[in-house]
Amino acid sequence: MEPRFMGQLPELMKNYKAEETEIIAGLQEKLQEVFQKAQQMQKVDRKGKICTMGVSYLQSSVLTGSYDLRIDLYDKEFYLDSAECCTYWKPEFIARYLLKDVEYFKNVIRFKVPQIKAYEIQQFIDGYLLNYMYLLVQFFQQILPQVLDKTKMLFQEAVEENMTVIFGEYMGKGIVVVGEKEE
């Protein structure tokens, strides 16, 4: 499992570097879209200032193989914020490698263990997915501060100065990737 991921990593990083400008521009576009939605909601008093941005992977997205990430903006109420404000972004630069690995493992596992059940394969994939999620955490820790600086300049009045960004499973526990970590 690990050798497969580690074997893919150099090619993934090389392709990321080659496509970095487009990847960041795509993310920037999605962030501007969701911050614009938040700003419109604030103008009609449906949402407070944005305190937290959640970037989440969705179990439904894992099951369908689309591997989209959901980007949510929350006011001070966080998960209790009833005014939903979100968009979706697919990190293609990672998803294509993950899809290749999933197909590879499905074939290898079915060949070696013919009686394996679909849910057992899915459990394996869920565990393997963590390799790529950790890679996304590192990506967001590096890229988001500069991308958010540009976005926050455009939407200053909509965002708290010390906005936090968390990454994790949707509505689950997350890792702080930008901002203050609470003790």
PLM regions: where:
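Acidic, proline/glycine-rich low-complexity IDRs
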Residues: M1-R4, D126-E183
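Short, Lys/Arg-enriched charge-dense amphipathic segments
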Residues: V34-R46, G65-L80, V108-K112, G127-Y128, ...
